[in-house]
Amino acid sequence: MVAQIGARHHYAIPRMLEKGGHLQSFHTDSNAVKGLGKWLAMVPGLRASGSFKNLAQRKMVGVPGSKIKHTDALLRRRILGALHLGPGYENYIQDDHLFDAIIAARGFEGADTLYAMQKHGTKMLEAAQAAGVRTVVDVFITPMCHHIVEEERARYPGIEASCEDQARLELEDERT
């Protein structure tokens, strides 16, 4: 089982696992193959720019549609926020927490291994381990990177301003 937000590695991990006969299911957010993302990606004016252009490019070649389990919750939240019909979009960390909770709540459908990105949170990893599912975590940047950057900023003042948003750094710590 693979769980990831967006087209990380251009969907290479689920594609390779499927090719090798090892992909049980692929859990992701909105994309151009299923759900709300599929319909929005068909609208010519929306496909032309920004986030909708990125959404229209999220096509999972080599992964059968029957194995793709998606959620439109992240996209819906952003759209409602942009229309002032819900809380505004603040940052990607909220997406990570929401996706993490959704995957943890879904369960693991008999999977023996969960491959997930480090940044998506710990609820799904803890739930998988509690269910006896082996976890493989893709760490594409050290979880403490922001601390290292802040230390470098303090060491070499004047080159780049320090992060004034301590709450954001605390959120980074919380999710890692």
Stretches found by the model and what they are:
Residues 100-111, 122-131, 143, 159-176:
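Membrane-proximal helix-turn-helix segments that form the acceptor-binding/catalytic region
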